[in-house]
């Protein structure tokens, strides 16, 4: 949407470098000038049906850049202003590693757009002292999961588990139409509760609304099933549109500026939010292990998909040759 708006705000002679004159002139500009919501509906319709040059935006950042003649390296720029994409097929940074260390980078890897995960920034931005929030987070998610601002530590398993929790919980929130900016209720303003919230509240909420019994563990499982479906669909999409279903190499590649910014600092020195390349590869290994994804390709294994009653998706991945991209011996050796 950001790129669409930038093009359409350009003067006609500039915009028609990216879309044809006929397409530009066919747009219902009277609706746009009048603030008529049909303007947005028409733009969305054209993108959904692949009509015109502008519709490439719906295919993601990589396809858009290819069409407009921009190399992938354009997103490696460390200019601090016009480039903030964390991944090459992602969206300008919104709640990533600058606020949530490796956890923020990991959960961004799952999506093709703004991941809209606020589970960490709601804690870092709560106004509570660091030591108070750290105690709450570590009691819920394990020692070492929560870093101080601009004082990051190397990846550990609890950070990877927290990232996976955030992804699954966000996918549940999307399905339940709950606001991820408010839920889950991780912290409490109550001193008597030692500022601990109640992660079970959303399960209680679901139970009250539906009349069926829900638990937090059950919601995590339901959210992870969605995560696995999304990941399998992403592999199919990348195979069809990018010619490769190796998600680790293509989809989960991180732009250089994340590691190269603030050159006066090294990663893990106090005063910077930059990440370390080798550390993030280790983080991916831990993250993939938690989700049951092949470490070489980042694709859910057949065993993982069948665990979530998604054997039909595993059959589809196999039929498309997506599982064939990793030699059996290499997978077993891992």
What residues fall within each predicted segment?
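Extended C-terminal regions of large enzymes
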Residues: 1-334
